[in-house]
A protein has these predicted regions:
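Helicase motor interdomain insertion/brace
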Residues: 1-887, 897-926
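Short hydrophobic/aromatic-enriched beta-strand-loop microsegments
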Residues: 891-895
Length: 926
């Protein structure tokens, strides 16, 4: 994104401070004013400055609170993708290899880090990649002599049970080393660094453990558990000492030019280090930031310190807002003399404030000006002027559903059992937050109930246990009810309110959002008519739900998706076998082509068979040229179809006149052959003549293709791709991978059946006709153009973004009443039942791994697209929610956060688009 004038001015001011020797600056712009855009501009200007002083390398380190934000924001800092390090490889202890890899490739590098993965060495044993690389360097350096195999066993840990899996990590890291242009020089330097940084005591301890492993080698299991030889804590401590050693080495090599600390108040320990704290994290932070006078440091935070102190904080002797402010300033003003001067000026200002007199303010004003001048040398802040542009009076609050008896029943059920078993009280906040608690919660109170059911506290008779479980009908989901698509019992007012909102329920219901596969575009190119489900749902928005409870996103993701399926299912009169019951579908659906052209490998009947798939994914240039939205903007769809049909008919009549080919009904294969022939004719190429020319009904299909075929629309949207062959191929592959797969999903097929219920003439062989009509009704061209504009991407980048916008239908387990009852018998069920997730998604996995980082990115990309999911429930707050805004103008707080800073915010992009109107004379009004 291009910086606005005030953002450009702020960035210029920051770099000017850097040039003058103020190497630590705080950017404290108000929330929503684009601190990341300012940071991007600072990155660009600092890079230009480094070039001016002939600095050949430019290294930027980006530190934020978690891996999700790192992935979200690194792409916005203006450094090319190939010069950015993946957050999964952003471990401080691995940077020595990354720096060697990029040395020969580029002189610009962006390295993302998080406090948990880079500075808190003691929190775990590191990643497998991290341990594998450390082992290989130690082996190459000969640090542990002949104990190579034993050291490998030690570094593997029991997390990697299979030796083959560990071997893969070793081979991958060795491959990275082998690819270095100066492999020998790198290994030589690392040997020298290890000799300087690895203490003799550590080497001695490692060798001692290796000797033990060698002595008892035959007794050790294959899963790498050391058993009685070494406790896990001892093994972890030893590995972490090695990790710390490599982190120190990387730190010495890193020497970044610019360090950006985003929302640093979430990890203030990095800048507020106690001199008596000798932990590994404190020592690394001190070397990286406190003792580093060369790197420029940019702190980003709208709330760098608390604006006030509460009475409780003062009573308990906790840090006050003044202490927090002074700690931040002590970091920013890092010269001793400068720091003393700032404290003197601020104390004088505070003293004058306390002695304020109405008859003489000149001394106070002079003191205030001096204090402001001192602050201005170390921080920048821009605030939004409230001129009434944002009118919150028009904001509509959700009306909460009335409590039903079932809402209270679930609490009574659980509290009654806990009281009888003497295991305490059930938290009422849980009951308010989620329904079917025994099916979804994973908290200690659930463990208490499970223990009581198992007879761990008191012996329990099986018949009493079965009766107790039976007496909790409001606390469990029943698999049998789910399988029959029964309505969910009204057990939670919050969930019912959410359903009313997102499914537009009520007596005056006009739209059916459960039938949508994408959000209706804000600027539709034509009027599709009242029959269009997209017209009925005009103005529909995605919904972002924040909750402090981990179970809530799982509840919302599963039950909202189930409710969407149920609402669709009840609209289908003639159900196929797979639509009659919920669990008729396999829990894991594979959409790849199998030998049967109508079925995939698991026997699931696909909506689009192979010939239809090829037709839907074919970007016909001939058809693309027949429709241009500007020509028909704002007109009725039926009139546009009439005009386009005549244009196509004229071309077909010309072919008939020249070749004498007769008309007849065409299938998908024949239509595809016709389009290939017509496209070749445009280029003056010779192609085999089609067997027949299209009938009048087929002309209608071609008209819908010209207006809204996904492949044709993509071809038009890729008008910035100059290579015509590449443009066609990008449109074809993108459509095949993304949109054909979308229509082939079970929930999409049910939607097609529901939408076209009662309409005649749609045989299984012509499902492609339904796709084209559905896309025309949904203003597909307008939707895809809006998405491209919102992303700001072009060509291959846009295609990649589309492919990343689709979440595969997944499923999450729940504990059904049947499963729970069976778990206490001698015949427990092998696997808990699962619920499909597609209409809504959850964003709640707090563990950091390559897999969860990828999932976080997938969820974010999908929710920030016009496609499903339409509801996202997340435990993230504050900054993590800021980027979920392109198609969402609704924010729901399931539980209000304690800190106002954590109230969810969204950019008003979608709301603004909805309020833009174009008058008949072309004037744009808001």
């Amino acid at each position: 994104m291009i910086a606005k004038d005030f953002q450009e001015a702020t960035a210029t001011r920051i770099v000017d401070l850097f040039r003058k020797g103020h190497n630590r600056v705080l950017l404290a712009d108000e929330v929503g004013l684009g601190k990341t855009i300012v940071a991007k501009t600072v990155v660009e200007k600092t890079g230009a400055w480094r070039k001016e002083i002939n600095d050949p390398d430019y290294v930027v380190v980006y530190i934020c609170s978690n891996a999700g934000i790192a992935n979200q924001n690194c792409s916005k800092l203006g450094i090319a993708k190939e010069n950015r390090v993946s957050i999964s490889e952003g471990r401080l202890s691995m940077q020595h290899l990354m720096l060697a890899e990029t040395e020969s490739r580029t002189n610009v590098r962006l390295i993302p880090m998080t406090p948990a993965t880079s500075f808190q060495i003691r929190s775990g044993a590191g990643t497998a990649h991290e341990r594998a690389l450390a082992y290989l360097i130690m082996e190459h350096s000969g640090i542990c002599g002949s104990y190579s195999e034993e050291l490998s066993f030690l570094m593997r840990t029991y997390f990697i049970e299979k030796p083959d899996s560990w071997q893969w990590y070793l081979e991958y890291q060795q491959w990275r080393i082998d690819q270095l242009s100066d492999k020998r020089g790198y290994l030589k330097r690392m040997k020298e660094e290890l000799q300087n940084h690895m203490k003799p005591e550590l080497i001695s301890d490692v060798k001692a453990v290796c000797r033990k492993i060698r002595k008892h080698w035959d007794e050790l299991p294959d899963n790498a558990r050391l058993g009685s030889l070494l406790t896990w804590q001892e093994q972890k401590d030893l590995i972490n000492q090695i990790r710390y050693c490599f982190a120190e080495i990387s730190l010495g090599m890193l020497n970044p030019d610019l360090v950006i600390m985003d929302e640093f108040q979430r990890f203030k320990d990095l800048i507020e280090i106690d001199e008596n704290d000798h932990s590994d994290g404190a020592l690394l932070s001190k070397k990286f930031l406190m003792d580093n006078t060369e790197s420029c440091v940019l702190l980003l935070s709208a709330t760098p310190y608390k604006p006030y102190s509460t009475l409780t904080e003062l009573t308990n002797g906790e840090e006050t807002h003044l202490q927090g402010f002074m700690r931040v300033m002590d970091f920013l003003v890092n010269g001793k003399q400068e720091n003393e001067r700032f404290h003197m000026v601020w104390e004088a200002y505070s003293e004058h404030l306390s002695e304020i007199r109405g008859d003489n303010l000149s001394v106070l004003i002079a003191s205030k000006d001096e204090a402001e001048h001192e602050l201005y040398g170390h921080m920048c802040r821009t605030e939004r002027r409230d001129s009434g542009i944002i009118n919150t009076d028009k904001a509509r609050a959700m009306s909460i559903s009335n409590l039903s008896a079932a809402n209270v029943s679930s609490y009574i059920e659980l509290q009654t059992f806990m009281h009888k078993m003497g295991i305490g009280n059930f938290p009422i906040e849980y009951v308010k937050s989620a329904p079917f608690l025994m099916s979804f919660m994973n908290y200690k109170v659930k463990d208490k109930i499970d223990g009581a059911m198992a007879g761990k506290k008191y012996p329990i008779d099986p018949s009493y246990r079965n009766k107790a479980i039976k007496n909790m009908p409001m606390s469990f989901l029943r698999r049998a009810d789910i399988n029959e698509y029964k309505p969910l019992p009204d057990t939670n007012a919050r969930l019912n309110t959410l359903f009313d909102e997102i499914f537009a329920k009520g007596e005056d219901r006009t739209g059916y959002p459960e039938l949508l596969l994408w959000i209706p575009p804000a600027n539709k190119y034509y009027k599709a008519g009242s029959r269009s489900i997209f017209e009925q749902c005009e103005g529909y928005s995605k919904t972002l739900v924040f909750s402090s409870w981990e179970m809530v996103p799982r509840v919302i993701a599963t039950l909202t998706s189930y409710e969407a399926e149920r609402l669709v299912n009840r609209r289908i009169g003639n159900k196929n076998i797979e639509q009659q019951t919920y669990y008729a579908l396999p829990e894991e659906v594979d959409f790849d082509d199998g030998e049967d052209p109508k079925k995939n490998k698991r026997g699931k009947t696909r909506f689009l068979i192979r010939e239809q798939r090829e037709l839907v994914a074919y970007p016909s240039v001939w058809l693309a040229e027949k429709y241009e939205y500007k020509t028909y903007y704002g007109q009725e769809l039926f009139k546009i179809r009439r005009d386009i049909k005549q244009l196509i008919k004229d071309d077909i009549d010309d072919v008939a006149a020249k070749t004498g080919i007769v008309r007849g009904s065409l299938g998908a294969k024949q239509l595809l052959s016709l389009l290939i022939y017509m496209d070749a004719s445009l280029q003056g190429e010779e192609r085999e003549l089609p067997e027949r020319l299209p009938s009048d009904e087929d002309l209608d299909t071609l008209v819908n293709m010209a207006i809204a075929s996904p492949a044709v629309c993509l071809y038009r949207a890729l008008d910035d791709v100059e290579d015509s062959v590449l443009r066609i191929e990008l449109a074809r592959t993108c459509c095949d991978q993304s949109f054909v797969s979308m229509f082939n999903r079970p929930e999409s097929r049910s939607i097609m059946d529901a939408v076209f219920e009662g309409r005649r003439g749609f045989s299984e062989e012509k499902h492609y006709e339904q796709v084209f009509i559905y896309c025309a009704d949904g203003n597909f061209q307008s939707m895809i153009d809006e998405y491209k504009f919102a992303l700001g991407g072009a060509g291959e980048d846009f295609v990649e973004a589309i492919n990343d916008s689709f979440l595969q239908t997944s499923n999450l387990p729940y504990v059904s009443q049947e499963f729970y009852r069976a778990s206490f018998t001698d015949k427990p069920m092998k696997r808990a039942p699962r619920l499909r997730v597609h209409f809504a998604a959850g964003y709640f996995d707090a563990k950091t791994s390559d897999k969860t980082i990828q999932r976080v990115n997938n969820v974010r990309n999908a929710f920030n697209s016009p496609f499903r999911p339409f509801v996202l429930a997340t435990t993230s707050v504050g900054q993590e929610g800021l980027d979920f805004h392109l198609y969402s103008r609704k924010v729901v707080h399931w539980n209000l956060p304690n800190n106002p800073i954590d109230v969810g915010r969204i950019l008003r992009t979608f709301k603004i688009k909805k309020n833009v109107e174009v008058t008949d004379n072309g004037k744009i009004i808001i």
